[in-house]
Amino acid sequence: MKALLATDGSPGAIEAAHKVLSLLHPDVKIDVMTVIPETENPMDTAGGMEGPVITVEEADQAHLIDERHGRLALRSTLDAVGASETSEMIEGPDAGRVLCRLAAERGVDLLIVGASDKGWFQRLVHGSVMEYVVHHSPCPVLVVRHAGSD
């Protein structure tokens, strides 16, 4: 059996990792993954504006911050559970779509996500990775709710 654990390094994601390790058989192969935003093209323009929205330097700096955050998310999740699972950081425009695509490509049997503490307005504006994955995953999804959420 193959499982894919999505993490953003948050307490909910780390709690999901702990729960999964206590529920699954030790022989299950668990891949830990985080998805970071794709690098913004500084030459893109905003509607009605002339010229680039951000400079090349700003785009590079933003990408470095995203990569640092991604590495930290993976490391904090693996360290918290004391696991030596394989981990990977992927770039993509939408984390939910990337996770579902990779689950299909890799023949994953179970996709694990933590439920975030986003309020209804944040979910409305930004969407929810968990909600997308639950509705579009090619395999069963285990959603672990953070103990501190309502």
Give the predicted meaning of each segment.
Residues 2-56, 85:
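Small/aliphatic-rich secondary-structure junction motif
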